[in-house]
A protein has these predicted regions:
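Active-site-adjacent beta->alpha loops and helix N-cap segments on the catalytic face
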Residues: 8, 88-92, 115, 128-168
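N-terminal amphipathic alpha-helix/helix-capping segment at the start of soluble metabolic enzymes
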Residues: 1-15
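Hydrophobic faces of well-ordered beta-strands that scaffold small-molecule active sites
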Residues: 10-14, 48-50, 106-109, 126-128, ...
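Short, acidic/polar
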Residues: 25-40, 110-116
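Glycine-rich, proline-tolerant flexible connector loops at the mouths of alpha/beta enzymes
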Residues: 18, 46-86
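Active-site beta->alpha loop and helix N-cap motifs at the rims of alpha/beta catalytic domains
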Residues: 70-136
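Catalytic domains of carbohydrate-active enzymes, especially glycoside hydrolases
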Residues: 32-53, 122
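Conserved, mostly hydrophobic/aromatic
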Residues: 13, 40, 119, 152
Length: 177
């Protein structure tokens, strides 16, 4: 399966930034996400990438903020993530379909098993966050879907990277290149 049809293959990181655009512009979250897709396409980007999660799966309700509170007043990690987890399967289906209409690849990094499952029908490739690079059970779960995976390796050691790659190679039918 050939995924990347050119080099360099450019991926625009939308993440959850569309929520801020929606608030600033006074438009719906979906319209803001589509606006960012349109802007990425106009810039010549090959793919757009979102982030899919539920706050309950990635942060303790008691975890305190680690960011500058003068910039973002939310005082807990859980509440911060909760602000940006409004989209689910149906919304990502709509974004995937919209990406097909405009001719850009849709990606979303799953941060939990449920997200990995519902995103499977919308994506040809998975993106694994650097925050999950040492989460070998999750990496194996994604690899078991037998689709190519992109691994983010920010702040990782060579050992952690090798372990993650081995987990994919041991589980997936898709060969890494």
């Amino acid at each position: 399966m050939k995924i990347f049809n050119k080099q360099p293959f450019l991926i625009a990181e939308i993440g959850v930034n569309f929520y801020d655009i929606a608030e600033k512009e006074g438009i719906s979250d979906m319209d803001a996400a589509k606006l960012m897709i349109d802007e990425a396409k106009a810039c010549g980007v090959d793919a757009v990438k979102f982030q899919s999660y539920k706050a309950e799966t990635i942060a303790s309700q008691n975890s305190s903020a680690y960011w500058d509170l003068s910039e973002e007043p939310t005082e807990s990690q859980f509440e911060m993530f909760k602000k940006f987890d409004k989209f689910g399967k149906e919304e990502y289906r709509q974004l995937s379909e919209y990406c097909k209409q405009v001719g850009i690849m849709f990606l979303s990094t799953p941060f939990d098993f449920d997200s990995a499952d519902y995103l499977d029908e919308f994506m040809d490739i998975y993106k694994i966050s650097s925050s999950d690079l040492t989460n070998i059970p999750f990496i194996k779960y994604i690899a078991s879907k037998n689709k190519p995976s992109l691994l983010s390796t920010g702040a990782a050691t060579m050992r952690e990277i090798k372990d993650a790659v081995k987990a994919i190679e041991d589980t997936s039918l898709v060969k890494l290149r």
